[in-house]
């Protein structure tokens, strides 16, 4: 049993490393993620201790997910994100609830890994500008795709085991 548990945690660790390797983010995207999180944390430092705020950006779009203890922090996150330069649009999906458990976060990582693997197998992920974030089984898809690519990608995401919902924040190519 100890060996299986060790293997499980090793797989979780390796999958997290691989997810990071597949990022298409620019330096500006990473900077906006860090600045937004700092601004939110500095505004209400005592409340943020009980918060789980995740910020992802892609081509100027900023996605905020996670859990916060009060509704006011949801609004604050959007306000702070909108003060940054080079932010085209803010998508705030924060939820007022307790922080996600370790098991839930691990499951979300596995869902993201599974989706990326399936997209690569079908050559839908190759050289495409997309970013996938999973929170509580809800998959957020960011990037730029043509309509047909988007439909195929969303269908694949929705049929992936463990996915509760798929939310497209994709900008369609014309």
Residue ranges and their predicted role:
Residues 2-7, 12-174:
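N-terminal targeting leaders
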């Amino acid at each position: 049993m100890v060996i299986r548990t060790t293997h499980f945690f090793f797989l979780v660790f390796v999958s997290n490393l691989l997810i990071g390797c597949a990022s298409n983010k620019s330096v500006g995207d990473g900077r906006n993620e860090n600045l937004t999180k700092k601004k939110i944390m500095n505004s209400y430092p005592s409340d943020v201790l009980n918060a789980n705020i995740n910020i992802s950006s892609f081509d100027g779009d900023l996605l905020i997910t996670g859990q916060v203890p009060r509704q006011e922090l949801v609004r604050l996150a959007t306000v702070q994100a909108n003060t940054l330069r080079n932010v085209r649009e803010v998508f705030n999906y924060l939820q007022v609830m307790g922080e996600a458990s370790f098991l839930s976060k691990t499951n979300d990582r596995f869902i993201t890994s599974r989706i990326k693997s399936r997209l690569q197998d079908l050559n839908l992920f190759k050289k495409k500008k997309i970013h996938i974030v999973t929170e509580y089984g809800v998959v957020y898809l960011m990037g730029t795709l043509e309509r047909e690519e988007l439909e195929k990608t969303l269908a694949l995401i929705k049929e992936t085991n463990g996915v509760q919902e798929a939310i497209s924040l994709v900008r369609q190519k014309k």
